[in-house]
């Protein structure tokens, strides 16, 4: 039994008075819904097939910088706009990785400029002025204490040292003066003030030159005397060692006189004639038994 045809035909849904469009106060209640893609998302740029889609009002002035960077963001155009109630419709497909939108300079608020080091260098504070004045006074006082500062050369570290004082040139004497000084020194090692002045006048020298020469000559004489005494002492030591060695060798080479007590005792006689340091044992007399 077939059902009547009127029962199979679906009835159109009546509009609900408390739907989303009524809540959002959308004036476009009777407009056709936007075409949707395979995944259920609506096309914002334009539906396939060339059919005109729903038109949306433009962005308000506060969102003017949001839509411009995304107009040419990929192979298809993306139209960011707001719904009548302020809802932003988002495309179902994300833009390609190569179409990354640039930063939004117009949408970002103006950040206050950060002070740099160069700008901070010109700032002056009271405590900075006092510190500078203290350092300046301190350096001024140090410079006043050392007015005669030695300037050092710039270069190798060994060249930065203070140059040494120049030595006085060595005074050279003539052969006649040296001979007269040596003769007087052999006769007299020390001179009095009057004797020194007379010798200096006779040799056409100054008192200081004669005094310095005698001081240096005495130092040389003491060193030579000490060296000679040391050489004599070493020579005497070597002589004593030689004499001791000769005496020891002579005592070894002398024949041992037999003791009368050992003649009647074979053991004592053998010990008396025993000489272990001798290499030739044939010289040792044979022990004869006297018993």
From Swiss-Prot:
Its BP terms in the Gene Ontology are:
animal organ development; central nervous system development; GABAergic neuron differentiation; negative regulation of neuron differentiation; neuron fate specification; neuron migration; regulation of respiratory gaseous exchange by nervous system process; regulation of transcription by RNA polymerase II
Where the record puts its DNA-binding region(s)? 166-225
Q: Where does the UniProt entry say this protein principally localizes?
A: nucleus
One GO cellular component term, please give it: nucleoplasm
From the Swiss-Prot or TrEMBL record, state where the protein is found: Nucleus
| Keyword check for ATP-binding | no
Query: CDD domains this protein is in?
Result: homeodomain
Q: What is any Pfam family matched here? A: Homeodomain
Q: Provide any one GO MF term from the record.
A: DNA-binding transcription factor activity, RNA polymerase II-specific
Does the UniProt entry include the keyword ATP-binding? no
**So where does this one cross the membrane?**
none
What InterPro entries does its record include? HD (IPR001356), HD_metazoa (IPR020479), Homeobox_CS (IPR017970), Homeodomain-like_sf (IPR009057), TLX1/2/3 (IPR042247)
Keyword annotations from UniProtKB, A to Z:
Developmental protein, DNA-binding, Homeobox, Nucleus
Residue ranges, annotated region (Disordered) = 1-56
Q: What is this protein called?
A: T-cell leukemia homeobox protein 3
- Provide the species name: Homo sapiens (Human)
